Amino acid sequence: MQVIETLAQGLKRELKVVIPADEMEARMNERLVEVKDRVRINGFRPGKVPVAHLKKVYGKSIMADLVNEIVREKPTEILTSRGEKSATQPEIGMTEDEAEADKILKAEADFEFTVAYEIIPPIELKDASGIKVTREVVDVGEDEVNEQIERIAESARTYESKKGKAANGDRVTIDYLGKVDGEAFDGGKDEDAELVLGSNRFIPGFEEQLVGAKAGDEKTITVTFPADYPAANLAGKEATFDVTVKDVAAAAPIEINDELATKLGLESVDKLKEIVRGQIESQFGSITRQKVKRQLLDQLDELYQFDTPERLVDAEFENIWRQINTDLQQAGKTFADEDTTEEEARAEYRKLAQRRVRLGLVLSEIGEKAGVQVSDDEMQNSLFQQLRQFPGQEKEIIEYFRNTPGAAASLRAPLFEEKVVDHLLTEVSVTDKKVSKEELTAEDDADEKPAKKTASKKKAAAKADAAEGEEAAAPKRKAPAKKKASDESAE
């Protein structure tokens, strides 16, 4: 077998592989001898069929199998011998000339094929001790815990129907139909919708006009959708809602005590406080983790600069671009609404794709050199988390991960990445800084705002961490249900 390099440009490689006809014929004859005793042909005793006759009957079929085996196995062997790793599955090229292909199958011509691929660039690991990150820490105080418990108690509050007019704090049950320019619009209709007046769940002006209403009342409410409403076809538009009030209910008083804890399935209010404190600490810890990780990745991105395999970047860009267009479509917006153009957005997200690929390769190399491993138990736990997100679809999900090429790798990748980050945090300088809840969440809130042209680079950088999964929140279906897109993102 002869291997000739025909292209070495940047990360691109192309090889020409030639296996002489006599070598292919020798392999075929070996295979014929192997099957000789198992073949049954009329007129011949078992094991007595001449090889020449077997070749005449089965030669081309066996040669075709050999060709398939060679193109399936040899590229990996060749790359290993060259000390190279292909970024993606190599592309195999063979003759499309039927006459030439027939000669190969008859061992009358050399078998030639090409292997085209992009190599993963060699990465020389650098000293990470100069990297400095700040870990923001929030002390969870009693006030924070009590506020959260009050919100829990509020969500568990009961209401009792009352006669008379609705006031702020009362819950009204309504049917409504929204119209713009006299025409009903998608998402503008609901029945038996429950709304606590004063909760500011609906768009400005909606709830205020229901104060004083009684069960059985029919009202027409006029409101104006906010200019930044996520559904572009409604943003800034005046709308009317035909509302039927079906019930008015007064809120029952709530008390934070052992009785409340019992309703929630806990033995005491102290246990409730303990659980709530743990949940808050976990939430703050997740934000802190992402901010530390972002700092780490930003500095790694500055530390490592090298060409990235084009095919990996193309694939990553397509994933990003598909999500961006889905988000825009769901929000009823265009690139112009985001103060940019499709061309500018493509360029920006192309840079993001390059960054993701580069950081992915760096983290992979660091993890490999550090001996980072993802255990079977960790994979199993990750799969269970997936199953919990989709109750009733457990069988389909398990089948998907079992039968879909690359599915298990997609489950492993974020686990591996987080473990590499853990490893790096033992090597870099980490300084703890106590901050308030508002300081901790301020930057994250800013990242959730619509990506205007001036903010697009910042948002792109924030999204470069593949594990963060930051995506624009999809707008709710019911038109009056939220007053701002940013409110939706918070839910």
Swiss-Prot record:
Presence of keyword Isomerase: yes
Region named Disordered: 434-491
Gene3D superfamilies found in the cross-reference section: 3.10.50.40, Trigger factor ribosome-binding domain (3.30.70.1050), Trigger factor, C-terminal domain (1.10.3120.10)
Limits of the PPIase FKBP-type domain: 169-254
GO biological process, one term: 'de novo' cotranslational protein folding
GO molecular function: peptidyl-prolyl cis-trans isomerase activity; protein folding chaperone; ribosome binding
Keywords: Cell cycle, Cell division, Chaperone, Cytoplasm, Isomerase, Rotamase
The keyword Cytoplasm is assigned to this record: yes
Record-level GO cellular component terms: cytoplasm
Localization (cell): Cytoplasm
InterPro entries the record matches: PPIase_dom_sf (IPR046357), PPIase_FKBP_dom (IPR001179), Trig_fac (IPR005215), Trigger_fac_C (IPR008880), Trigger_fac_C_sf (IPR037041), Trigger_fac_ribosome-bd_bac (IPR008881), Trigger_fac_ribosome-bd_sf (IPR036611), Trigger_fact/SurA_dom_sf (IPR027304)
Catalytic function, reaction form: [protein]-peptidylproline (omega=180) = [protein]-peptidylproline (omega=0)
EC number(s) given by UniProt: 5.2.1.8
Bias (Basic residues) ranges: 452-461
Domain of life: Bacteria
Pfam family, one: Trigger_C
Main location: cytoplasm
NCBIfam families: tig (TIGR00115)
Similarity section: Belongs to the FKBP-type PPIase family. Tig subfamily.
Entry's free-text remark on domains: Consists of 3 domains; the N-terminus binds the ribosome, the middle domain has PPIase activity, while the C-terminus has intrinsic chaperone activity on its own.
Biological function: Involved in protein export. Acts as a chaperone by maintaining the newly synthesized protein in an open conformation. Functions as a peptidyl-prolyl cis-trans isomerase.
Name of the molecule in the record: Trigger factor
Originating species: Sinorhizobium medicae (strain WSM419) (Ensifer medicae)
Gene: tig
